[in-house]
Amino acid sequence: MATSAQLREQITAGRWDGPLAALYGTAPQELARQRARYCAALEQFELYFGPGRQVQVYSAPGRAELGGNHTDHQHGYGLAAAVTLDLVAVAARNTDGYVRVKSRGFNKLDVIDLATAEPQEGESTHSASLIRGIAEGFRTAGKAIGGFDAYTASDVLRGSGLSSSAAFEMGMACIWNGEYACGLDARALAGICQYAENTYFGKPSGQLDQLASAVGGVIFADFADPAAPQVEKIHADGLLPPGMTLCVTDTRGSHSELTGEFAAIRQEMEAVAACLGGKVLGQVPETDFWAALPRLRTVCGDRAVLRAIHYYEENARTLAQRRALLEKRFADFAAMVLESGRASFALCQNVYCATDVRHQGLSVALALSQSILQGSSGAWRMQGGGFAGTIQAYVPETLLQRYHTAMERVFGPGSCYVLRLREQGARQVL
């Protein structure tokens, strides 16, 4: 192990270019940016927690949802990819039983007493609740953990659909796993992080986001048994055809205040399932749903019915998308991306909030994407939880400059990201 000052010297000298290139690519400009970013994070750690401490540096990627919008929490399928936008955490063990985390861009220093395991009043929906919940997840798994101090710097857009929460959670989990030699694998860490998000943070999410960040590459997951999801890793290299680029545009609307909207999707789907004798739609045959449609409209309401239809269609589509990727049939995959996007408008109804129709950033971004990409080999859809945040688009290189310029003209400089898929999951880097 090295001190933060020693690591900064080594990074500047290029000693760690190999591990950095494995995560971010070999382009000289990007490597220079990452060297500067890592050095800045190490400096900030020293500022908040003092110089001379031996530290380790961890990285947890964000994720792009490729298919399976709001299917994972119903015990369906999910398809997602880790991306090169990530959270970097500089960490050092301490001996006082406290966790202290300072995150770039946030004024508050999170301080968590590990002696207090239960969820704390007023802490839900805040990062401190995630840290406390992850600690309890490790203890429940029989692991002996202690305190640490950490500084985090995240390029994963907060509240934007790239799952900044999963990147933060996986960063914290990797620190404990590494600093205290817990030896848990990626899937176990993802389960602990989902537990923290559900039970302590108060967001009823599935596990797809955490798995994508933990495992890396492109993953296909079957959540029929959510306690032990079946995960298939599809290597990211070569999935996109030559000349095709994945872009994500931040419409500058945040998910941060939309927990109630997300929860309503799950609640309505599960209300339909309950009428048919199941807890989730994954336990209810689709034929039973269609047979009971008149009664379901009366009991659950039409929006719940439409969201259930979305689940069945999107789940089948996600399975077909997996096969298209494995067989390198990108044109078929792209056609299903468009179908998924249309379903978000018509069935799941999570492109904008019905209570705030004046603000429809996702709708505008999708319409603009259609105006540029229609008739090309590209595709576009909303991604993530919905209602605000980001859209994704597969953009041919011949249209990339036009697309990028148009999106940033509407949504502001720095809003359109040209992404690379990342093969590696959350891990210690230095």
Go through the PLM ranges and name each one.
Residues 140-148, 176-192, 397-410:
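Phosphate-handling active-site elements
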Residues 160-248, 430:
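Fold-level recognition of mixed alpha/beta catalytic cores in primary-metabolism enzymes, strongest
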Residues 1-63, 88, 92-124, 220-381, ...:
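C-terminal nucleotide
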Residues 53-54, 70-77, 116-124, 154-162, ...:
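A short glycine/serine-rich beta->alpha loop
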Residues 59-64, 68-75, 155-172, 376-394:
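Glycine/serine-rich anion-binding loops at beta->alpha junctions
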Residues 76-96, 215:
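Structural signature of FAD isoalloxazine-binding scaffolds in flavoprotein oxidoreductases
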Residues 100-102, 147-154, 183-195, 334-339, ...:
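Beta-strand segments within the central parallel beta-sheet cores of soluble alpha/beta enzyme folds
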Residues 135-157:
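Glycine- and acidic-rich phosphate- and metal-coordinating loops
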